[in-house]
C-alpha cells in the first residue's frame, strides 16, 4: 500500500500497487512520494526497478527533473516545487516517550484558562492564533517551545521575528516563561558570521532568528531543514507572497513535512482573501481568532474609550486647495471627456483610490492597444494620482507637508524630462503657484486644525500635579515621518509638561535621518522609565516592539487598514482602562475610518463563523497515536535574565571557540575603504602567486566584487582563444588566471555530473565584466 500526495493540494489517496522484486527481494513500493524515478514502476524492466529512496533536494538545478507518480504508477512532472518525505507512521524522529506522557503548563501568578486551551491546540495542530495585543501570545509560544524541547531531544525549535529589535525582546520573554538558561538559546541574525551560526546550530537547539537569516542558512545548507520540529512566526500576517516568511516555509517543506507551525498575530488580515493567503502559506490546520469582545478573554481586557474628533480645514487651506485643483483640472477634464472617470468624482476632492480603480479598468480594456493616445491617458492617470495624494496631505496633515511634497514632485518631474507630470510641474503657472505658496505661508499659522486639538488633549491629560503626569504616558501615531517631526517640534512649546520624543525607523528620507537600533532602544527605555512621557511614532511603533502600556493613544491620521488601526489601539488598555482619540478631517478621513471598521467587522465575522477559509487537512501528527499527553501544572525555575542574555550574546559574537577561523578574523577587522582599482591589483597579484584549491575557487567566485559594472562595455573574452596553442604576446585575457583554470576545469568535467559542471560555470558571467589586461607573460609561465 502506498499513499500518494499530490503536490498541489496535499490530498491523500490510497492505491494498491503490486509488489516488486529488487535484488532478489520482494516488497511494496517505497513510501517516498516525490522521487527521481527512471521510468514507470509498472512498465519498466524489473532490473531497473530499484527506487531512489533519497528525496530530491528541490532547487533550480534539478527543478525540471523532479517527478511524482500518478495513480497508474507513471511518472509525471511535479506541479509545485515541494518535496514530501516519508509517511507519518514511518517517520524516524528521535522522541522522548517518557516526556510525551504529559505536557507542561508553567505555574504563574495569574492563571488564564484561554491560554491553557490555546496551548493545547497549538501542540497538536498548525495553529494561526490571532489575539489582541497584551493577552499573552508570547507566553503561549513559550509553552509550545518548552514541550517540543522536551518531546524531541535532538530536534530544533526556531522563533522567527521580522525585525532584529524583536529578537532580544522575544528571547528574554520566552526564556522567562520556559525557564531556559541564556546558554540554551541563541539569537541569530545577519550580523552573526556564518561560521558562528554553524557552531550554534551544532551546539544548541532553540533559536531566535530573522527570517532572512534562516532562509539563507537553509539555502547554503548550514542548517538541515529535517532537523526542525517547530517553527513559530511572530507577526504572522506578513506571511504572504514572496515575504521571507513565505520563502522560509517553502524551503522547509521541500524536505520536511513533519514539523509544527505556530503563527502569532493581532489581526490575521484585512480581508478574507488575505487571511486565506496566510493559511495557505503557513499550512494552517487550526485557526483561532479572538477580539476584545470575545467571551473567553473579555474578563482580561480593560475598557478602551474611543472618541472620534472631526475637524474642518481652514479657509486659507481651502483657497490653496482650490488653486492647486485649477492647475490639474485640464487633465481631469480630458479623462472625463473620455468617460474614464466616474461621474460622481469631483476635481476638487479627487481620491487616489478612485483613480487607481479607473486606471486598472482602462488597462485591462486596452491591453492589446498601442497608440499615442493610450500613452497620454496613462500619463494623465499617473499625474492625477500624484495630485490626489498631494491634496490628501494638505487636507489631513498641513501646509508644510503639502509644500514639501510639491517640491519633491517637481524635482522628480524635472529629472524625468517627459510625460504629463513634466509639463505640469515645470510650467510657468505651477512655478508662480509654488512661489506664491512659499511667500504666503510665511505670514500664516502653519498649524493644521488637528494640531490645536492635539495640544488641547495633551494639556488636559497632563494638567494634574507633577507627580501625576510623571506616571502618565501617551503615544501619538502618524503615517508620515515629516508629520511626526513637525508634531515633535511643535510640542517643544509646552515642555516640561509634555516631554516628547520622536520614534521612527532606520531608513533615511529626503529631509531627515533615521534612528538606528541603539537610538530606538534608548528611546523606549526612557519612555518606560518616565524620562519621556509622550512618544510620537510612525508605523514602527504599531507592531512588535514591547513599548509598554500607555494611558492614552492619539491617532493623528486614520488608516484604511484595519490591521494598523487595531495595532495602534492595542497599545493601551493592557493593565488598566485607556483612552483612544482619533483625529479625522471631514469629507476626507471619516470615510476611510468607516471603511476600515466595516472591513474589520466583516472579516472577524467570517473567520469566527468558519466559512470561506479553507484549512489544511493533511497536517501530520508528530507524536505516536497511542500516546495522549496529560496536562501537568508545574512551577518552573526562572533562569533567564535580560542582562545575562545580552552579555552572553555579545561574548559569543566576539569569541568563536572551535570555529575561530581566518575568515572570521577577517570579518571582524575594519573595512578598507580603497578605490576598487587598488583592490583589483591586489587580487591580480594574489591570484598569480598561489594556486587556489577547489573550495577557494568557489569562495572566491562568491566574494563581493564591488566593481560589478566595471568594464561592462568592453569586448568579452573569446573561449577558443584559451584552447588554442598559439597566443600572441599581447593577447588580451581576463585579469585573473582563475578564469582560465576554471574554464579548462569545466572542459575536463564534461564526463562528470551536470551539477558539478554547473557549480563552476555558474559564476562564469561574473568574469565577463572584469577588465581585460595584458598578462601574456604570466600566462606563458603558468602553462
Swiss-Prot record:
CDD domains listed in its UniProt record: DEXDc_FANCM, FANCM_ID, SF2_C_FANCM_Hef
Q: Name one GO cellular component term.
A: nucleolus
* Similarity remark: Belongs to the DEAD box helicase family. DEAH subfamily. FANCM sub-subfamily.
Which UniProt keyword terms apply here?
ATP-binding, Helicase, Hydrolase, Nucleotide-binding, Nucleus
GO BP annotations, alphabetical order: double-strand break repair via synthesis-dependent strand annealing; interstrand cross-link repair; Okazaki fragment processing involved in mitotic DNA replication
Q: What is this protein called?
A: Putative ATP-dependent DNA helicase fml2
> Which EC numbers does the record give?
3.6.4.12
Tell me where it resides. Answer: Nucleus, Nucleolus
What molecular functions are annotated in GO for this chain? 3'-5' DNA helicase activity; ATP binding; ATP hydrolysis activity; four-way junction DNA binding; four-way junction helicase activity
Motif DEAH box: chain residues? 234-237
Entries under SUPFAM superfamilies matching the protein = P-loop containing nucleoside triphosphate hydrolases (SSF52540)
> Which SMART domains does the annotation name?
DEXDc, HELICc
Q: Which PROSITE patterns match?
A: HELICASE_ATP_BIND_1, HELICASE_CTER
**Which superkingdom?**
Eukaryota
Q: Domain Helicase ATP-binding spans what residues?
A: 118-286
Q: State the species of origin.
A: Schizosaccharomyces pombe (strain 972 / ATCC 24843) (Fission yeast)
Domain Helicase C-terminal, by residue range, is 450-619
Q: Which InterPro entries match?
A: FANCM/Mph1-like_ID, FANCM_DEXDc, Helicase/UvrB_N, Helicase_ATP-bd, Helicase_C-like, P-loop_NTPase
